[in-house]
Amino acid sequence: MVVIRLARGGSKKNPFYHIVVADRRKPRDGRFIERVGYYNPMARGQDIRLQLEKERISHWLNQGAQTSLRVKHLIKKLEKSPEEAQKGGMRKGEFKRLQAEQAAKAQKKAVATEEPKAEEAKEAPPAESQAAEGKEE
């Protein structure tokens, strides 16, 4: 039986997977029939995370090939949002810096919205006291 699956490459703690069409009886990283794409889970910055040859995959699926669960998930992810699937992630430092910037913006916005509310609150009690005086009369 022919299967579309991941073949691991890359170095220690730095995985890189080729998406291959292979005979199920062959080893995971062994002999394959055709290479139809790749998946780089450690992609950063401008690196492409997922690349698939859709025509060849559909050809093999029409021929009766089965997909592994992970490959099936990757195909769905690519069909759902191609830009998100291909976009690489951020480095740890970049992510922390971005979070700090967003927190600072949110804090500035919160302070800016509190100041007008405080001014309105100062003006509001005289209006309420006038309304209360009007009710008493």
Swiss-Prot record:
Any GO CC annotation of this UniProt entry: cytoplasm
* Keyword annotations: Ribonucleoprotein, Ribosomal protein
Q: Which Pfam families match?
A: Ribosomal_S16
Q: According to the lineage, what is the superkingdom?
A: Bacteria
Q: Where does this protein have compositionally biased stretches of type Low complexity?
A: 126-137
What GO terms are given for molecular function?
A: structural constituent of ribosome
Q: Where is the composition biased (Basic and acidic residues)?
A: 80-99, 111-125
Q: Which InterPro entries match?
A: Ribosomal_bS16, Ribosomal_bS16_dom_sf
Stretch list, region Disordered: 80-137
Keyword Acetylation set for record: no
> What parts of the sequence cross the membrane?
none
Q: Which GO terms describe its biological process?
A: translation
Among SUPFAM superfamilies, the record links this protein to:
Ribosomal protein S16
Q: Kindly give the NCBIfam families that the UniProt entry links to this protein.
A: S16 (TIGR00002)
The UniProt similarity line reads: Belongs to the bacterial ribosomal protein bS16 family.
Q: What name does UniProt use for this protein? A: Small ribosomal subunit protein bS16
Origin species: Coxiella burnetii (strain RSA 493 / Nine Mile phase I)
Q: Which gene encodes it?
A: rpsP
